[in-house]
Curated annotation (Swiss-Prot):
Record gene name: zip2
Topological category with respect to the lipid bilayer: Multi-pass membrane protein
Main location: endoplasmic reticulum
Key words, A-Z: Endoplasmic reticulum, Ion transport, Membrane, Transmembrane, Transmembrane helix, Transport, Zinc, Zinc transport
Stated name of the protein: Probable zinc transporter zip2
Annotated function: Probable zinc transporter that may mediate zinc remobilization from the endoplasmic reticulum under zinc limitation.
GO cellular component, one term: fungal-type vacuole membrane
Organism, scientific name: Schizosaccharomyces pombe (strain 972 / ATCC 24843) (Fission yeast)
GO biological process terms held by the UniProt record: intracellular zinc ion homeostasis; zinc ion export from vacuole; zinc ion transmembrane transport
Transmembrane segments: 6-26, 48-68, 88-108, 267-289, 305-325, 329-349, 368-388
Location in the cell: Endoplasmic reticulum membrane
Domain of life: Eukaryota
Pfam families, per the entry: Zip (PF02535)
UniProt family annotation: Belongs to the ZIP transporter (TC 2.A.5) family.
InterPro entries: ZIP (IPR003689)
Length: 389
């Protein structure tokens, strides 16, 4: 069997993923084109929500309408199987694949969560320093303004930066407002585990020098949710990248197998679009975490270039092993693998990608996510109708 088509398509779709990773440069190109800032990927979740939700819709429809259909076509070719047996084996493989993938995803999340708690991820990855413009905007108070906090001795990452100044005094001797927050010195400001908090406004009862610059500081709400969000941006970026790259292994498997049948066009188109989105989805959280476009792009391109071809290699080895048996055995093997992979795709869509989109969606009733999710399904349906004609 000639497998060159499978390798060409797999590598081509992988190139789409690398192309998608370059999307983190999109705002620079757009802003340069217009001559002023119209797009800021670093401070907007809209692009990420759009990509994730649309990708989830494409995968959901593809898993059920395309991959499961391919599974049925293979299994119905087996002479000893009637339609009932075909459906039994197909749905058993479908649910088995979904359960295995769900368990795998559960333990992966658990391991990553424990790693973030023990500092494993922070010890093995570093965060780039803020850009000069960011550092300029985050000016620290004058040296005369000391930070006094009852939480300072706790030693936790957040308590080194954020604290309540209850009953504290500034150098001028003026009593500060209870609950005011001050930024620690500049060395803590660039720490990878720091949370930036600033005094919201200049205290009305103090006119000393140390409060003269507070009006220019960025402000944060200081709520526990905001602090937790800022503190977990780095870990979230690593988790998202690792999860999606590990999920791309079965995608490479699907792409390679789909290339062997004439009716695989729908899956290939869906996977091509999906990989453009996923390339951006891998690179974007890393860019948010590292604040470095080249580092995020190279990391995303490297991870995707390893994971998808690995799935294709596994499919190639399975096909070579199955080729030595009977045609019924080969059809059974392909049918079971396609059905199991469809179950994995369903869990990937509904359990991993869509919830991630909802988590970043701040629109009313998560409307943005559900609109993009529906568009993904309708777009895939349109491509299938177009392909059938």
């Amino acid at each position: 069997m000639n497998n060159s088509k499978g390798w060409i398509l797999s590598l081509s779709i992988n190139a789409f993923c690398v192309f998608g990773a370059s999307g983190i440069y999109l705002d620079k190109l757009v802003n340069k084109w217009f001559g002023y800032e119209v797009l800021d990927l670093a401070n907007s979740d809209n692009a990420l929500v759009t990509g994730l939700a649309t990708s989830s819709g494409i995968l959901l429809y593809s898993s059920w309408a395309s991959v499961m259909q391919e599974s049925f076509h293979f299994l119905e070719k087996i002479s000893m199987f009637d339609t009932f047996l075909v459906r039994v084996f197909q749905f058993c493989a479908f649910f088995f694949g979904g359960i295995v993938f769900y368990i795998f995803n559960h333990f992966l999340h658990k391991w990553l969560h424990e790693s973030s708690q023990t500092g494993f991820l922070h010890d093995h990855f570093s965060v780039s320093d803020p850009s000069p413009s960011t550092a300029q905007n985050h000016r620290s108070p004058p040296a005369s303004c000391k930070r006094l906090s009852s939480c300072e001795s706790s030693g936790s990452p957040s308590s080194r930066v954020v604290g309540s100044l209850q009953g504290s005094y500034c150098p001028s001797g003026t009593h500060l407002h209870e609950g005011s927050l001050l930024l620690e010195d500049s060395s803590a400001r660039h720490s990878s585990d720091s949370v930036h908090e600033y005094l919201v406004k200049k205290p009305s009862n103090c006119d000393c020098e140390c409060h003269a610059h507070f009006s220019s500081f960025p402000t944060h709400s200081g709520t526990p949710d905001d602090i937790e969000h800022i503190h977990s941006v780095y870990t979230m970026g690593i988790q998202t990248a690792l999860l999606i790259c590990l999920h791309k292994v079965p995608e490479g498997f699907i792409t390679f197998l789909a290339s062997t049948v004439d009716t695989g066009f729908m899956v290939l188109v869906a996977m091509s679009i999906h990989n453009i989105v996923e390339g951006f989805t891998i690179a974007y959280p890393l860019y948010l975490a590292w604040k470095s476009r080249p580092k995020a792009f190279l990391t995303a391109a490297t991870l995707s270039s390893c994971s998808l071809p690995l799935g294709s290699l596994i499919a190639f080895l399975v096909m070579e092993a199955g080729g030595i048996g009977s045609s019924d055995f080969l059809n059974f093997l392909y049918g079971i693998i396609f059905a199991g992979t469809a179950g994995m795709m369903l869990i990937l869509s509904l359990r991993v990608i869509l919830p991630e989109a909802l988590r970043h969606d701040h629109s009313e009733n998560k409307r943005h996510s559900f609109i993009c999710f529906t568009i993904g399904i309708l777009f895939t349906l349109f491509l299938e109708i177009f392909d059938s004609h």
